[in-house]
Swiss-Prot record:
A GO-annotated cellular component: cytoplasm
Family matches, as InterPro entries: HBDC (IPR022390), UbiD (IPR002830), UbiD-like_C (IPR049381), UbiD-like_N (IPR049383), UbiD_Rift_dom (IPR048304)
Organism: Chlamydia caviae (strain ATCC VR-813 / DSM 19441 / 03DC25 / GPIC)
Molecular function terms from GO: carboxy-lyase activity
Record family assignment: Belongs to the UbiD family.
Protein name, as recorded: Uncharacterized protein CCA_00454
């Protein structure tokens, strides 16, 4: 179904009992997000809240809360569409063959924007700018305020005019000011930097849209010179209608519920945060640019789209998977040494990436690894797992086992200190600063991996288990652990990888839990420990085990958790929200 129309999508999901209308009064401060979290945890339907306290507009959440629903929403996109494009680009057809590719060529004609000359603009202007009229959510008890959680932030480069549509959370500061949480390696932040270099404000337009293709495109890691609007229109198969406005150089998209027009203020910063983010922890308060809102448009029957982020699985996980499904065929074209590539949403995407690569000559895998770490937002990858063995990247235990049976640590373990880091990842010494590691397992297997620890007792270890062959998980505490004693323990030398955790049962409950608890809680430069006997040719002679200290450190932000008052309130009112269920 072509579900760029939010109202048609809502009607269809309602008819399939995959959307529930909630008419009970609900507070956008903590209560609504807690309802949402319980529903998405149980793979439940989309939610349309009609009676949000203090607001004139209904709130839609959990639109992307299951993989099945995401697949249905984007089912108009033909399977194999991107591979067809790649084939067409790599082998341009002869004139006589164009008819065979007519559907793809017609889709190409749908790219971009179309000025709506005869369509009435479906929005009206808010009498005066008042951001308090929007039902912004406070999702977690220690959040610094209410946030736009699905804003589509449109900017243009002051020099080239190349546009960017990105998704950056926006905290409400007052009736006409929002924060601009521009993260590194994102286009909006690049444009703001350009504007400040010229001592100018940056025109910014914020769309709140229920068009799934716009939302998906806004989170796509596209090259800086490719517009997200092109991807949106290519996937949905139709142009986006727009009109001009005298108060902004930007197009106003008809496919929006709300449109906020304003600018990022040059050289002005406001304390932004904390905010419980998609890593599952609070991102802390830092100074970020401010957006001054000059005008607000909204549909007469506007629906406010929102999402809640936190520990996986949330809506961003399912959207991220769909996006990787579409974009993964492009990786071998952009990076010829790559066969497959996947970033793991269970670890916040940027914390962990796996790749199957080619090894057509000695250490081609290293060249490809560096190519991956130099490619756009992939440059924020913290751990990169590489093999040339054909393995299903969706099966992370198998990928890790494949690498551990092949890795030669003094050759295939590479650590980079003093690198950039995802803005939301606090494992490094400062904001946006961190480190990286590459694990490579190339060629045939060279060892049999242990499945169970059979050695002597380990100092200050209270429990242990295996995640996969070759990976031993040890339960301990930060206060008790003795890293050197573990590295030098003779009975651990046969284990390529050892992981430290506070709670073994929680960590080994599932692959999702292992990924989240392991890779969101360590920095390679400070928390990856390994022995080496000497340094030769500027390389340490590493020996097993490689130890990952994934214990919570004192400087890490807290995990996001709902407060007890809200938990009890939602439990008490549950039948009010869902009287028919």
């Amino acid at each position: 179904m072509a579900m760029s129309s939010l109202r048609r999508l809502v009607s269809l999901l309602r008819s399939q009992n995959d959307l529930i209308d909630i008419f009970a009064p609900v507070d956008p401060y903590l209560e609504l997000p807690e309802i949402h979290r319980r529903v998405i945890e149980n793979q439940g339907p989309a939610l349309l809240f009609h009676n949000v306290q203090g607001a004139s507009f209904p709130v839609l959440t959990n639109l992307f809360g299951t993989q099945k629903r995401v697949d249905q929403i984007f089912s108009k996109v033909p399977k194999g569409l991107i591979p067809q494009v790649i084939h067409l680009l790599s082998s341009p057809p002869k004139l006589s063959q164009l008819w065979k590719h007519r559907n793809l060529l017609l889709r190409g004609l749908s790219l971009g924007l179309r000025k709506a000359r005869f369509l009435k603009f479906p929005h009206k202007k808010m009498a005066s700018v008042d951001l308090h009229q929007l039902p912004m959510l406070t999702s977690w008890p220690e959040d610094g305020g209410a946030f736009l959680t699905l804003p589509l932030v449109y900017t243009e480069s002051p020099s080239s005019k190349i546009p960017n549509l990105g998704m950056y959370r926006m905290q409400r500061f007052d009736r006409d000011t929002l924060g601009l949480h521009f993260q590194i390696q994102k286009g909006g932040g690049m444009h703001f930097y350009e504007a400040e270099q010229k001592n100018e404000n940056l025109p910014v337009t914020v769309f709140l849209s229920g068009n799934p293709f716009l939302i998906l495109s806004a989170i796509a890691p596209l090259p800086e010179n490719i517009s997200e609007l092109l991807l949106c229109t290519f996937l949905q198969g139709s142009k986006l209608h727009y009109k001009n406005d005298p108060d902004t150089p930007h197009p106003l998209l008809y496919d929006s519920e709300f449109i906020l027009i304003g600018e990022g203020i040059c050289n002005e910063r406001r304390p932004e945060g904390p905010f419980g983010d998609h890593f599952g922890y609070y991102s802390l308060q830092h100074d970020f640019p401010a957006f001054k809102c000059r005008k607000i448009y909204h549909r007469k029957d506007a629906i406010y789209p929102a999402t809640i982020v936190g520990k996986p699985y949330q809506e961003d996980f399912y959207l991220g998977n769909k996006l990787q499904e579409y974009l993964s065929p492009l990786f071998p074209m952009v990076m010829p040494g790559v066969r497959q590539l996947k970033s793991y949403g269970e670890a916040g995407f940027h914390a962990l990436t796996g790749a199957v690569v080619k090894e057509r000559y000695w250490k081609e895998s290293l060249a490809t690894s560096l190519r991956i770490l130099g490619e756009g937002q992939l440059s924020l990858t913290k751990f990169l797992m590489i093999t040339d063995h054909h393995v299903d990247l969706d099966n992370f235990p198998k990928l890790l086992e494949t690498i551990l049976s092949r890795i030669v640590p003094e050759r295939d373990l590479i650590i980079f200190s003093e690198t950039s880091n995802d803005t939301l990842d606090y494992t490094g010494p400062k904001l946006n600063k961190g480190s990286k590691a590459i694990f490579m397992g190339i060629g045939p297997a060279i060892r049999d991996l242990p499945h169970k620890y059979r050695g002597k007792s380990l100092p200050n270890i209270t429990n242990m288990g295996t995640f996969c062959p070759g990976c031993l998980v040890l339960e301990t505490t930060l206060q008790q652990v003795n890293i050197d004693a573990l590295l030098n323990h003779p009975d651990l030398s046969s284990w390529p990888l050892v992981v430290l955790t506070e709670n073994l049962n929680e960590t080994l409950a599932s692959s999702k839990d292992f990924l989240w608890k392991t890779f969101t809680r360590l920095a390679p430069a400070t928390d990856l420990h390994v022995r080496f006997s000497n340094v030769a040719h500027h390389r340490p002679n590493y020996t097993f085990p490689i130890l990952l200290n994934s214990l919570m450190k004192p400087h890490y932000p807290k995990e996001v958790e709902a407060d007890e008052t809200t938990i009890q309130k939602v439990s008490h009112r549950w039948n009010e929200y869902f009287p028919k269920y």
